[in-house]
Amino acid sequence: MVKLTSIAAGVAAIAATASATTTLAQSDERVNLVELGVYVSDIRAHLAQYYSFQAAHPTETYPVEIAEAVFNYGDFTTMLTGIAPDQVTRMITGVPWYSSRLKPAISSALSKDGIYTIAN
């Protein structure tokens, strides 16, 4: 017969190894900061592509905080707080490589941080 303490110890071990998860609205600032972090990293990695896109779409504007974050290689997350969720969505989904590059990277980053999103 299995002792209750053995079962409790097993459950505790499983619980200790499981990642904590949080479910947040897509417009939550924590979600936005993860999205913007991926976005800034992608701009840094593909700067010429973003310059070409902006030249072809001059009416697409970006908050000054994005440019500051791209060229400031320190901790930039505090710079990005306060950008409206609808503006975050517009910037990120407005580039042609959103589905192929940004969306998978954002999903991966959110999952890594234990964040799952729900529609607003």
Curated annotation (Swiss-Prot):
Cellular component terms (Gene Ontology): fungal-type cell wall; membrane
Protein's cellular compartments: Membrane
Annotated keywords: Membrane, Transmembrane, Transmembrane helix
Family membership noted in the UniProt record: Belongs to the SRP1/TIP1 family. Seripauperin subfamily.
A Pfam family assignment: SRP1_TIP1
GO terms assigned for molecular function: structural constituent of cell wall
UniProt membrane topology term: Single-pass membrane protein
GO biological processes: fungal-type cell wall organization
Keyword Ligase tagged: no
Membrane-crossing segments per the record: 7-24
Top-level taxon of origin: Eukaryota
Species: Saccharomyces cerevisiae (strain ATCC 204508 / S288c)
Record-given protein name: Seripauperin-12
InterPro entries: SRP1_TIP1 (IPR000992), Yeast_SRP1/TIP1_CWP (IPR050788)
